[in-house]
A protein has these predicted regions:
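Alpha-helical ds-nucleic-acid-binding substructure associated with the helix-hairpin-helix region
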Residues: 1-79
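C-terminal accessory module of base-excision DNA glycosylases/AP lyases that mediates lesion recognition
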Residues: 44, 64, 68, 83-158
Length: 158
């Protein structure tokens, strides 16, 4: 999904659910969620995750005490949360400084272009980035931000 499409869906989501209350989202009419731009599968994921938050199964107040890998494992145990989403939570919500979101195709391709890597496919580019980014520790999130800035002509305010 493009940044522009995601921003549009997020704007419509906030217009419909301004408080972003887990209980309200858990019991939301699926048609209303589809109307803001979510697919049937995403509606299942969003309402399921909201139910987990509402039930207290997800405890964001405890996230800061977890190591990156432990938090990533916790998040990806939720249906619909994959490695990319977990990495975005680590970077943007938890502000972890050393996250390298190798599942971000835009990041991988932009790094290959910026560094002039002649890797034949995405898998090879991803591995080249993983190895190269070791030198960025413990600031891989920061390096990721700079590559994303290069990717987007217009800065995105997060």
């Amino acid at each position: 999904i493009s940044v522009a499409a995601a921003e549009g869906i997020w704007r419509r989501f906030l217009a419909t659910y301004p408080s972003v209350d887990a209980r309200a989202i858990a019991s939301a009419d699926p048609a209303a969620l589809r109307a803001i731009g979510l697919s049937n599968r995403k509606v299942e994921y969003v309402t399921g995750i909201a139910r987990a938050f509402a039930a207290g199964d997800v405890k964001p107040a405890q996230w800061s005490s977890l190591a990156d890998d432990a938090l990533r494992d916790h998040l990806t145990s939720l249906r619909g949360v994959g490695p990319w989403t977990a990495d975005m939570v680590l970077i943007f919500h938890e502000r972890r400084p050393d996250v390298l979101p190798l599942g971000d195709v835009g990041l991988v391709n932009a790094a290959a272009r910026l560094y002039g890597w002649d890797a034949p496919d995405l898998r090879a580019r991803r591995e080249t980035l993983r190895v190269h980014a070791e030198r960025w520790r413990p600031w891989r999130s920061v390096a990721t931000w700079y590559i994303w800035l290069e990717l987007d002509a217009e800065p995105v305010v997060y």
